[in-house]
């Protein structure tokens, strides 16, 4: 489908650049207007099963209902922008190697409600399928309750914070290494690089 093609192209772009992560939500009809929570869960899992494995992508579970102040209406909006925003917020209040999920840094703002609110069992299903559930906890707000990347096999890189840490490290090492170009390849130069 077109959705899978877009997701695959975004992943290919992120993997080619190797300096970013693609945040993706399921197609709108997977959760918006779906009466049964179990059906919405299966729709989300099915949507992302067609997308290739990658540590450069992050999947979320749906849409939030929010006020669109520019058009003066309430509407459902995909959560991928919010998840990217939580990563930026985490950088601001902590560091890239902290998880953007949970009650400390994973609060999704501006949500009136979710297109569907997965139960604990459904959250477990989603998490096993590489999807980060976003859940409304009564009295505590809407929270990103997972920190997986879209990688299918177990690895350190199947966590958002680990992938983001390595993006930061790779960039820092590349910046430092360029100043060692055309220098003598001797013990002094190597020690200087190690001690940067």
Which residue stretches match the model-derived regions?
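Structured, hydrophobic secondary-structure cores that serve as assembly/anchoring elements
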Residues: 1-196
């Amino acid at each position: 489908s077109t959705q899978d093609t877009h997701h695959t192209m975004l992943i290919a772009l992120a993997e080619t650049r190797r300096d970013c992560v693609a945040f993706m939500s399921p197609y709108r009809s997977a959760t918006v207007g779906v009466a049964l929570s179990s059906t919405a869960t299966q729709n989300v899992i099915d949507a992302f099963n067609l997308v290739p494995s990658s540590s450069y992508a992050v999947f979320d579970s749906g849409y939030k209902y929010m006020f669109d102040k520019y058009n003066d209406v309430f509407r459902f909006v995909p959560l991928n922008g919010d998840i990217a925003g939580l990563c930026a917020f985490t950088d601001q209040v902590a560091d890239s190697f902290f998880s953007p999920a949970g009650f400390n840094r994973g609060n999704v703002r501006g949500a009136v409600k979710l297109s569907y609110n997965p139960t604990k069992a459904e959250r477990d299903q989603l998490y096993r399928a590489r999807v980060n559930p976003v859940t409304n906890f009564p009295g505590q707000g809407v929270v990103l309750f997972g920190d997986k990347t879209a990688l299918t096999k177990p690895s350190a890189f199947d966590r958002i914070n680990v992938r983001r840490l390595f993006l930061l490290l790779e960039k820092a090492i590349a910046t430092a290494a360029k100043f060692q170009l055309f220098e003598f390849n001797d013990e002094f130069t190597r020690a200087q690089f190690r001690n940067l």
